[in-house]
């Protein structure tokens, strides 16, 4: 059941419903979970719940039409503070937390959250992209969390609790958001008219890792065209790893200069490869071919000339999963892409160490 238009997080809704009913509102929350599953949207709706002038917060049902609710949606509510990483920066500037120059400690979120509420009964701060707090910024924020101002609520939005200082984790109530189910992602894509075709929406959802942001990014014809080239190369009995690596690096570079879109594209391609090898391993064990017709064609071609066994195909899929886990940790995309594809080639031809 959707809460305020947010799908897939009924357990989180119930957790907050119980807390509010018991009057146990924390001063700091740490929202953690995969990118693109609705954490920031949930934070805004929760802020709207706490600031709504027409309905008590215990109902967890903001009216949506009072001035306070409208201002939250418009980003103009005087008691709602939001900061995040600027698009052109790799970190959240410490100035957003404590001010700059001679205004240091007299401006910024840590100062502003300490002020008395202007309109509602609370002051609320949302720190988006909290993964990108640097050490100085995190330590400045910690001072506020250690002595939270009365009637204040701070929400940090992060992908993982491990990305925060232990001292911040210990002072926060951690709220975990899970991947969205594929059916939910497909329904949202159709509702947003990313596509009007149910089969296409399901295909995008299947590769989205439960993230609506990733599903939207998958709706790119050039991406699927390149997937065909990648799978054609992987289906060869002796993959040309160097040629494939050059092509993959070039395609990832086309995503732009910023790291997030490049990493997302890399994840997409590694995910395609992992799916190919999973289906290949199953097909070598006489399982049914995949429903995706293009993928099935590449798998059948590989089955006919595969120089190894199903365990090798499964090992290749596992190597792709290892690559997915390391994408965010590697600054040099070209190097890890070359290593990943070289490892696959060695596994297929029996040259692995």
Regions found by a protein language model. Give the residues of each.
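Charged, glycine-rich active-site and insertion segments that engage polyanionic ligands
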Residues: 2-49, 150-152, 159-272, 277-353
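Arginine/glycine-rich "motif VI" loop of SF2 helicases in the C-terminal RecA-like domain
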Residues: 74, 147, 194
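Clamp-loader machinery-focused feature within the broader ASCE/P-loop NTPase space
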Residues: 2-136, 301-304
């Amino acid at each position: 059941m959707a809460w305020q238009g947010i799908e897939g997080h009924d357990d989180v809704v119930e957790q907050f419903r119980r807390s509010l009913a018991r009057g146990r509102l924390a001063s700091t929350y740490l929202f953690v979970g995969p990118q693109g599953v609705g954490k920031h949207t949930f934070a805004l709706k929760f802020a709207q719940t706490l600031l709504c002038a027409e309905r008590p917060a215990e109902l967890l049902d903001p009216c949506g039409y009072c001035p306070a609710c409208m201002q939250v949606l418009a980003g103009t509510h005087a008691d709602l503070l939001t900061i995040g990483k600027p698009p052109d920066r790799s970190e959240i500037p410490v100035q957003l937390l404590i001010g700059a120059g001679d205004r240091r400690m007299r401006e910024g979120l840590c100062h502003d959250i300490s002020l008395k509420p202007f309109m509602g009964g609370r002051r609320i701060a949302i720190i988006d992209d909290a993964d990108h707090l640097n050490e100085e910024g995190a330590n400045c924020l910690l001072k506020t969390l250690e002595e939270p101002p009365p009637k204040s609520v701070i929400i940090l939005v992060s992908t993982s609790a491990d990305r925060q200082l232990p001292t911040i984790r210990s002072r926060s109530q951690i709220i975990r958001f899970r991947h969205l189910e594929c059916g939910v992602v497909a329904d949202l894509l159709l509702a947003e008219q990313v596509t009007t075709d149910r089969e296409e929406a399901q295909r995008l959802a299947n590769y989205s890792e439960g993230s609506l942001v990733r599903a939207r990014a998958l709706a790119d014809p050039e991406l699927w065209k390149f997937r065909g080239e990648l799978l054609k190369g992987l289906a060869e009995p002796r993959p040309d790893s160097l040629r494939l690596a050059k092509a993959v690096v070039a395609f990832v570079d086309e995503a732009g200069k910023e790291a997030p879109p490049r990493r997302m594209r890399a994840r997409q391609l590694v995910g395609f490869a992992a799916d190919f090898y999973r289906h290949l391993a199953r097909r070598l064990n006489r399982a049914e071919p995949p429903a995706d017709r293009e993928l099935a064609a590449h798998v059948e071609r590989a089955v006919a000339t595969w120089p190894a066994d199903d365990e090798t195909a499964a090992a290749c899929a596992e190597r792709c999963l290892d690559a997915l886990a390391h994408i965010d940790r590697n600054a040099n995309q070209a190097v890890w892409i070359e290593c990943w594809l070289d490892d696959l080639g060695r596994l297929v031809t029996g040259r692995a160490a």
